[in-house]
């Protein structure tokens, strides 16, 4: 049997919001596998849904810039929120996004080698790090290309804590911006149901089936329950099926269609998502500084 540490139990409790004994029981039953433990708790009806474990740690800004038929969305990290509001840092983020839209590099390493008035983007980042006094890094970026009768829309929430980029076929830029605002607020995972991978559907169907079985319903009722809950799940993660944030009486797809278009693609960056915050023991830090 796998050894279940207190740290692992706490991680599961923080992730899904269950009691200590339930968390430990689930981890023991699944031999310490975090993902299987989450499913175990959901299937038992102890937890209805798993909360994301992405503890936002890094600060910084995301930005969207466009050049001709290319749009770029970038995330640049700093160590503190204070630096993220620094004008020099803001200008640096915009410069990076603009250069990425212009040059369309293959990856982060290639982006850092792009030419700038002071040398390369990497040189600019190093200089900003030295002047501002905090580590600054280009974490990620993505680009979209538009064709004839296609429109970009972008939206920055809280000055760039969340950035959304949308590509519509048809409609217009104003509609695209409205959809980008929705993407920033609601955080869909896919454009439509057809994009949801089969393994995601199979996994959710299995969990929902076991959850329904645990409620002691007849088989025919269970099938209907699972179908209904699966449809609800798909509507929650598919942009086209979501209730449009500015008019909940219609879906995003219907809103865009009313403007003569359809959603082709979107990208959403939330600063620091997926990066675990480093916790520092202040007393221990002082002891290290004193060489103890």
UniProtKB/Swiss-Prot annotation:
GO terms for cellular component: cytoplasm. PROSITE patterns: EF_TS_2. Keywords: Cytoplasm, Elongation factor, Protein biosynthesis. Gene3D superfamilies: 1.10.286.20, DNA helicase RuvA subunit, C-terminal domain, Elongation factor Ts, dimerisation domain. It is found in: Cytoplasm. Coiled coil: none annotated. Its main location: cytoplasm. Residues 80-83 are annotated as: Involved in Mg(2+) ion dislocation from EF-Tu. One of its GO terms (molecular function) is translation elongation factor activity. Belongs to the EF-Ts family. Associates with the EF-Tu.GDP complex and induces the exchange of GDP to GTP. It remains bound to the aminoacyl-tRNA.EF-Tu.GTP complex up to the GTP hydrolysis stage on the ribosome. This is Elongation factor Ts. It comes from Pediococcus pentosaceus (strain ATCC 25745 / CCUG 21536 / LMG 10740 / 183-1w). The gene is tsf.
């Amino acid at each position: 049997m796998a050894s279940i540490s207190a740290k692992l139990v706490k991680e599961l409790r923080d992730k899904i919001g269950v009691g200590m004994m339930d968390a430990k029981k689930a981890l023991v039953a699944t031999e310490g596998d975090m993902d299987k433990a989450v499913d175990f708790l959901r299937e038992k009806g102890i937890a209805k849904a798993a909360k994301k474990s992405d503890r936002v740690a890094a600060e910084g800004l995301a930005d969207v810039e466009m050049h001709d038929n290319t749009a770029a969305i970038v995330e640049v990290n700093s160590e503190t929120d204070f630096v993220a509001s620094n004008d020099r840092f803001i200008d640096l983020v915009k410069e990076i996004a603009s250069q990425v839209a212009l040059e369309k590099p293959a990856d982060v390493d290639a982006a850092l080698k792009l030419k700038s008035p002071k040398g390369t983007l990497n040189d600019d980042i190093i200089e900003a790090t030295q002047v501002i006094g905090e580590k600054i890094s280009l974490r990620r970026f993505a680009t979209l290309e538009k064709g004839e009768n296609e429109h970009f829309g972008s939206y920055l929430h809280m000055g760039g804590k969340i950035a959304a980029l949308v590509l519509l076929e048809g409609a217009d830029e104003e509609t695209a911006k409205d959809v980008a605002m929705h993407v920033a607020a609601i955080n869909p995972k896919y454009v439509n149901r057809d994009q949801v991978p089969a393994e995601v559907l199979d996994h959710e169907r299995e969990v929902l089936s076991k959850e329904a079985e645990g409620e002691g319903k007849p088989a025919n009722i269970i099938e209907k329950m699972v179908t209904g809950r699966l449809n609800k799940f798909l509507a929650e993660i598919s942009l086209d099926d979501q209730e449009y944030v500015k008019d909940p009486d219609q879906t995003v797809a219907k809103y865009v269609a009313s403007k003569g278009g359809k959603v082709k693609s979107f990208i959403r960056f939330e600063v620091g998502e997926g990066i675990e915050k480093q916790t520092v023991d202040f007393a221990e830090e002082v002891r290290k500084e004193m060489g103890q």
